[in-house]
């Protein structure tokens, strides 16, 4: 009896503790430099400093000189603005870099009209993407600084009825080589196709390397939505031929820079719910890099040297994704990019759980109701197993007086008392560990749903009813955690009373402890637990009354 109870609550406590540890690991404070230091450095270093650009080594080109610092800076008013149904981006003509990106279908804050801004190049935060051509003849490696592109106009809009929009930037170097940098935007998409065409009108063979990278300072994640001062994971990630998905923190970039060669993969910067990623052409050899330069974290790729004969043209292409962690969008953009929706080691359970949750939501149009219905589905799947466990617990409750008599009769002779209790269990066909199964079975589902709620952008700002306006954050009035504690008390009343007074007191404290523990958990997760407890109480109550009536 004692062993069963200790095992049951021990499993619950350990699972909760492991959950908190995982929360701290995934959403704990990142070891970044102070924001003040980063902001100060921005007055000295802006997003257009070309010493941030990669240096093409002897293995990829004949040139290996360090790229000089750009001296050209374009005023913010001269940026090229592009608007689609999903994105509003700004392109700096210097280098043709994307320096701003707003997600038009996602609000910065609940109830506010302003869209969420993921990329920006301002006085308080630098998070931009850079791309171009380096190497022997690459214009981004010119001693005079990065190329200043021209465009036909300064504002582009994806018109109604159009499925794509091409934004072309033009530049001609001193040798007469013509460059066309094209950004192709697509309706309903967050991926941007980049094409750099080199028209070698000179008399010499052109040689250069394609590069693309993401550059970010150490400022906090503006999309964080956790409590207790905890922050979501903010850092890089790499995918290559050896590993499908590897996190690379900003501190790792500084202490142990990464440089690896591959023919498939991508590089990305992750934050809560959103991601930016560069995907080179698959099948072509590239070097993936993650490093720091001053106060900036840089992750990107550099291609091998390309040669274009005089009078010929060549096009170097890649894809940039900037937007929410929508799994269908990520899967269609690049292999393994959907792994940036990090469900942890229970991904194999979390993925189908999310699929089922999404399917239910498509019918009920409410994520809170979908969570309740998914609990019903889980309870239905494990109904027989739970029923057997509850019958075992009901029998334990029924024979509680006899167990108390055995304890009184044999006193301190624990060996004899254990023998008599086991004989009683065998006679009455009672499984002393049977009551553990309901909690143990639902623990993986509980942990998986935790990751689903924390990682799925679909639940960001998703309302339920009444006071719950966002299921991805804590209950603002702590009503659900209190209801969860009450449900645990009720569930305890249906269980057999522990024979040990100290154990009984500990059991009474557990609902209070778990209520406090769950105060800061996402409301959707607590809603799942309250619903699960309520259905368990109903099932256990019916079974307990049935067994008592049989007596």
Swiss-Prot record:
Gene transcribed to yield this protein: yidC
Biased composition (Low complexity): 34-50
Cited CDD domains: 5TM_YidC_Alb3, EcYidC-like_peri
UniProt-listed GO biological process terms: protein insertion into membrane; protein transport
InterPro entries: Membr_insert_YidC, Membr_insert_YidC_N, YidC/ALB3/OXA1/COX18, YidC/Oxa/ALB_C, YidC_ALB_C, YidC_periplasmic_sf
Keyword list, A-Z: Cell inner membrane, Cell membrane, Chaperone, Membrane, Protein transport, Transmembrane, Transmembrane helix, Transport
Protein source organism: Marinomonas sp. (strain MWYL1)
Family: Belongs to the OXA1/ALB3/YidC family. Type 1 subfamily.
Protein name: Membrane protein insertase YidC
GO CC terms, sorted: plasma membrane
Superkingdom per UniProt: Bacteria
């Amino acid at each position: 009896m004692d062993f069963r109870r200790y095992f049951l609550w021990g499993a619950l406590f350990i699972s909760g503790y492991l959950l908190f540890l995982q929360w701290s690991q995934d959403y704990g404070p990142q070891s970044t430099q102070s924001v003040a230091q980063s902001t100060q450095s921005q007055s000295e270093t802006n997003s257009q400093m070309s010493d941030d650009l990669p240096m093409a080594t002897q293995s990829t080109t004949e040139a290996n000189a360090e790229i000089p610092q750009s001296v050209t800076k374009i005023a913010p008013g001269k940026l090229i603005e592009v608007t689609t149904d999903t994105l509003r981006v700004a392109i700096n003509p210097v280098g043709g870099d994307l320096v701003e990106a707003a997600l038009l279908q996602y609000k910065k804050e609940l109830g506010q009209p302003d869209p969420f801004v993921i990329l920006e190049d301002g006085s308080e935060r630098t998070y931009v993407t850079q791309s171009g051509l380096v190497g022997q003849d690459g214009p981004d490696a010119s001693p005079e600084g990065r190329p200043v592109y021209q465009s036909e106009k300064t504002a582009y809009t994806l018109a109604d009825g159009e499925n794509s929009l091409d934004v072309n930037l033009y530049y001609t170097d001193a040798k007469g080589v013509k460059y066309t940098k094209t950004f192709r935007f697509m309706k309903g998409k967050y991926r941007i196709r980049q094409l750099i065409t080199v028209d070698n009108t000179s008399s010499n063979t052109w040689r250069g390397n394609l590069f693309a990278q993401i550059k970010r300072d150490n400022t906090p994640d503006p999309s964080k939505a956790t409590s207790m001062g905890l922050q979501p994971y903010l850092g890089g990630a790499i995918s290559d031929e050896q590993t499908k998905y590897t996190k690379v923190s900003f501190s790792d970039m500084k202490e142990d820079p990464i440089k690896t060669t591959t023919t498939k993969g991508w590089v990305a910067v992750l934050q809560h719910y959103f991601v930016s990623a560069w995907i080179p052409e698959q099948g072509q050899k590239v070097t993936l890099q993650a490093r720091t330069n001053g106060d900036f974290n840089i992750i990107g790729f550099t291609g091998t040297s390309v040669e274009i004969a005089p009078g010929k043209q060549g096009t170097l292409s890649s894809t940039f994704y900037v937007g929410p962690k929508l799994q269908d969008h990520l899967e269609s953009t690049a292999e393994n990019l959907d792994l940036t929706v990090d469900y942890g080691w229970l991904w194999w359970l979390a993925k189908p759980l999310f699929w089922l949750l999404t399917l239910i939501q498509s019918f009920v149009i409410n994520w809170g109701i979908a969570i309740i219905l998914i609990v019903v589905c889980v309870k239905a799947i494990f109904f027989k197993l739970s029923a057997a466990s509850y019958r075992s617990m009901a029998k334990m409750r029924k024979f509680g007086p006899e167990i108390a008599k055995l304890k009184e009769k044999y006193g301190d002779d624990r060996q004899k008392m254990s023998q008599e209790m086991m004989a009683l269990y065998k006679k009455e066909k009672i499984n002393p560990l049977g009551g553990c199964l309901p909690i143990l079975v639902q623990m993986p589902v509980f942990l998986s749903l935790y990751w689903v709620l924390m990682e799925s952008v679909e639940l960001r700002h998703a309302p339920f009813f009444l006071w719950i306006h966002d299921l991805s954050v804590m209950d603002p009035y702590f009503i659900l955690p209190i209801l969860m504690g009450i449900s645990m008390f009720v569930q305890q009343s249906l269980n057999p009373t522990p024979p040990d007074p100290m154990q009984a007191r500990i059991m009474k404290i557990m609902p209070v402890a778990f209520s406090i523990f769950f105060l800061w958990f996402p409301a959707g997760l607590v809603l799942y637990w309250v619903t699960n407890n309520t259905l368990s109480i109903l099932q256990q109550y019916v079974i307990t009354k049935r067994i008592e009536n049989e007596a």
